[in-house]
Amino acid sequence: MKKREAFAKLPSVDSILSNNNIKNLLDNYPRELILESIRDVIESKRQEIIRIKEDEVETFDIEEDILIDDIIQSTKNKFQLSIQKVINATGIVIHTNLGRSKLSPNVQSELIDIAFGYSNLEYNLENGKRGSRYDHLVQIIKRLTGAEDAVIVNNNAAAVLLVLNTIAKDGEVIVSRGELVEVGGSFRISSIMELGSGKLVEVGSTNKTHIEDYKSGFSEETKAIMKVHTSNYRILGFTESVGIEELKQQEEFKNIPIIEDLGSGVFVDLSKYGLTYEPTVIDSLKKGVDIVTFSGDKMLGGPQAGIIVGKKEYIEKMKKNQLTRALRVDKMKIAALEATLRMYLDEKEAIRNIPTLKMITCSLKELDEKAGILLNKIQELNIDADIQKEKNVSQVGGGSMPLEKLINLVYLIWKKDLEKVKRI
């Protein structure tokens, strides 16, 4: 058989459309989508013929059932949502590639109400006048953090950009070289800072920065001092850094705002739950930081957002910055964030109901109970395999608490019928 004979075996679009399975498909999917899938599959077979050698053409065959199945699957793949629910079996709690923090089930009803109806997003129900979308969040954030004011944008990088564009545009911002982190995907804090301010003044070295380094970087053009919490890595050993309190004591910096990018945004002192202490938003403000920025979807356990808290005089300027309009959050994020924040009014409720906090503070006893439930489900599959429970370690993830190792339990499964395990 020659290649031209193989090409002749390829069915026409019309002949495929007459297939009963394809007719059934037309009842549930758009015709144009099915036609596209038919053409894609036929073209794939055509390319397959082109690639094979002449002496292999004899073995080439087109099985109609397989062809139809490919068309059906291709159509379904095109129609289904690209973003899908997955099981996180990585051992990383806040996995950036898997969507970071899970929202609490308590947030679900709030989201449904707001998503499927109208809302008072920018309407004041008390006076019947236009309101601000930020009013829904400012009071609860002020209560939880002790900040004078707050504004929310769509992520923490946007928060840093807005802060610097408002406070330090056309001026200089001092930052330690040891705090110029890369936040993932080749995005560096230095690049974001340069977009927002006129000039970045790097001081000190990677492992050591002294107060004199900050003083040497100070000039008449200095508009702010930036502190970046290195939440996604630690430099250990021969190191030194300058704390907020020491910076606040310097006469030169008396009228210079200190900005701190906390990144992960912790509201609870996790050392009370047997974990390493991680600086909280409240602690930073108590130390005298003028502006703090942090993420909503990391340790806070809410939706993606960049939260800015601090002195009212600076926050008011940010709210008037034209960038705020470009970076603003929508009603869905506001609803999810408010519902998440309200759980923090009772710390025990937050630990119990916010999935991220619940997972990282979970005791070994609780894990063992969950492991027992999982084992029962595995055994129900009647897998002919050896199953062994072992202790293991996981991580917080999301650029948070890089040195913290969380004890967990895993099942090792090996031998026969491993295909069934995929259904767990």
Where do the PLM segments sit?
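Long amphipathic alpha-helical segments
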Residues: 1-76
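Flexible, glycine/charged-enriched surface loops at secondary-structure junctions
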Residues: 54-58, 83-84, 236, 255-256, ...
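Long amphipathic N-terminal alpha/beta scaffold segment
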Residues: 57-103, 110
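Conserved PLP-enzyme active-site core in the AAT-like
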Residues: 80, 128-344
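Short, flexible, solvent-exposed loop/turn segments with mixed acidic/basic and small polar residues
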Residues: 82-87, 191, 294-297, 348, ...
